[in-house]
Amino acid sequence: MKLNLFASLRLFAIILMSLVLSSCGAMKPLPSDTFYRLRITAPTAGDTSRTPWTEHLIRVVKFRASGVHRERAIVYSDDASLVVQQHRHHLWVDSPERMLQQELIQYLRSTGVAPLVSSSESRGDGFEIRGEIRQMDQVMQDGGTRVTVGLAFELVSLSGQPRLILAREYQKSSVTNGKELIETADALSAAIEFVFAQFVGDVDELFDK
């Protein structure tokens, strides 16, 4: 009787272990993370005839952002922008605050607005640019997706007492070519490039007066 009970328990344990191993084998592997860069093309200094903004340094500080826009996960929202979520496995290569700082530095260097554009501290004359990310979203809507970028800029003169020269907000929305995240990253890059061009154009106009 004891032998039969032992054999039954052993058979039950073997069946249970087989079921556990079978279920483990059927589990889907965890999704891997995918990383995205911004791709922004700046005009070269030779493409434009502009008056330099300053003969001194322009410092671009790290952008400000709040909540989800400080994190690396790509943000998406509904059409009304009331519900904001994150693509947990689709990430920017760096935080949006730092990415936009570096992209704006490269953009301004290419346009020739100053002899030196940097993120370094400036103690002399020149300008400081402060940016804020208001929106940088993939927007889900009926029939497709679009992107919306909202950025605010302040241009501050560092000659003598710091003085605000310009404060302006910009927004750009556009429809994406598809629902893949690589297409969203491309569309966000194009929207940011458009906003950078608007900001630079507004400052050019300010100094051309």
Predicted regions: what they are:
Residues 25-47, 53, 110-161, 177:
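Surface-exposed short loop/turn segments
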Residues 105, 109-113, 200-208:
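Sec-exported extracytoplasmic/periplasmic mature domains
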Residues 63, 132-136, 171-173:
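Generic short beta-strand segments
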Residues 97, 101-105, 189-192, 196, ...:
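Extracytoplasmic/secreted envelope proteins and their assembly/folding machinery
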Residues 24-96, 206-209:
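A structural "domain/chain start" motif
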Residues 81-91, 160-198:
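Short secondary-structure boundary motifs at beta->alpha junctions and helix caps
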Residues 1-22:
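Sec-dependent bacterial lipoprotein signal peptides
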